[in-house]
Amino acid sequence: MKNSEKTLDMIVNLCKNRGFIYPGSEIYGGLANSWDYGPLGVEFKNNVKKAWMKKFVQESPYNVGLDAAILMNPQTWVTTGHVGNFSDPLVDCRACKSRNRADKLIADCEQGQNVDVDGMTFDQMDEFIATHPEVVCPVCGKHDFTPIRKFNLMFKTAIGVTEDSSSTCYLRPETAQGIFVNFANIQRTTRRKLPFGVCQVGKAFRNEITPGNFTFRTREFEQMECEFFCKPGTDLDWFAYWKDYCEKWLLSLGINKENLRLRDHEPAELAFYSRATTDIEYAFPFTDWGELWGIADRTNYDLGRHQEASGKSLEYFDPETNEHYIPYVIEPSLGCDRVALAFLCEAYDEEHLTDSKGKEDVRTVLHLHPFLAPFKCAVLPLSKKLGDKAMEIRNELAKDFMVDYDDAGSIDKRYRRQDEIGTPLCITVDFQTVGDDKVEADNCVTVRDRDTMEQIRMPISELKEYIAKKVAF
């Protein structure tokens, strides 16, 4: 099933009905664009994070991990420019009072498709909207907007018992700065030599004007970021290395290459401090292309700014050349929620089958990479009379894997339920497993493959090794 044949509604319905993702605070009417990961969703998302940490930290000879605080000294965000400049271009519709991002309005209109919105200033956006009546409000369809004004995306809060300017603090809008301010600590305590990287998975918060498309753009989200420090002059080589590394990670977890593209930023799109930026984009069902991963050569801008503002040296002493210099940084930045959504979109399939009697049926299946699947296997007793043996097998397997147990309904219906949530293997316990008056016990079970639906008979003693090989990454 091609992505062009899928819809966001298909993905959302499966997620809600099968316990992947629920609307946040639903019993109180919900909170706009707030989502809670359910029992299956939390396992799936944790597996996405594990897959990232495995390849970017555990198996990488260069990188180490970090878990920095969400709340940071507010001077951090003054130094980085977030307090003054981290904003979106906001316009109000005078007719219906709805609020919209000006750049999105321009990009969404037919004549705006070939316009380089990312390279436009606020004044240029204002002029474009004023001179193009086809830019209309998505709510009421009118062309009647206020001038653009800056809308700061940071969530402001207060620390302590009183609220004044001295207690102002912010929920971090990105995880990267926690890495930069800890650069000297990490380099000193790990005794790392350049090049090396620091990886972090954590929550970030942005007060988006127009969040939407399920978990694609939300105000609370999780990032998986790497800040890779290298010697100036080697940065473009490392930039190419991490572009290739990131794309291979996606492909190795089941993303089809035809659903990915690498888009290099034009010079007008680049931040003034960036030498190069490439977005890895995915063909989501609800848009032509949506950004998954940003890989940027940030030069020495971040460390340089923090050194200047803090008065603390963030230079690196190179023992090979006896030089002191501020390292350059390559930043591969990935949204965990967004890439998890891409994996769901990629894996979703509706297969049209015909049974032995000629009856047509539709099988909904998630072809998730087994490492990402919430459950690695499901134990299914053919009869509830076999529950004791089935539960014994389940409990033993659960020491090493996430295992589901289902004894309700026909075996075919139970297979379909597991297909729909992406369980790679179903283990059926039958009367031959335990034996009875008519058949001798063989201590074997039937193992069914999710993708091929093929079944094999296997000794219980070989299950763990078989499952481990099937779900390896």
Walk through the language-model features, giving the residues of each:
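NTP/phosphate- and nucleic-acid-binding module
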Residues: 1-473
